Amino acid sequence: IFDFKKIDGAFKYFLNKYKFTVVEGVGGILVPLKQNFFVSDLIKKFNLPVIVVARFGLGTLNHTLLTVEKLKRDRQKILGVILSGKKNKNDISVKSNASIIKKITGLPVLELGYNEKVDLEKNRWIIK
């Protein structure tokens, strides 16, 4: 499905041409791109720093912590976590997930609702 020679060439081109390049994780670090080659392998191959992006709400702790655990096990550079989407203010998990993730992982966590702007001065870790 994927032409990995073209993908390799495109990655090398963009990573060398631009100071800042964003690579979308296409659904998670364990999404297979081909047999026995996952998004996590692509991260390793190009030594990409990672920002874990997760939704607010129930289930986020589990998949975010598993993702961070896998990245740490693979010795990947994790810049932080962004929780994004709709904030249901009546959901206790929405109120507590960011602080729990920060406490357990030691990573910076940014909560970003729909159409909210990011203060890059307060969140410099995003553009390292």
Where are these regions (language model features)?
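Structural motif
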Residues: V22-E24, I51-V53, I82
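A contiguous pocket-lining binding segment that forms or flanks enzyme active sites
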Residues: P49-R55, G59
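Short glycine-/polar-rich loops that comprise or flank the Walker A/P-loop
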Residues: F46-P49, K77
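ATP-dependent carboxylate-amine ligase catalytic core
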Residues: I1-F37, D41-K44, L58-L65, E69, ...
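C-terminal lobe/tail of nucleotide-utilizing enzymes
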Residues: V68-K128
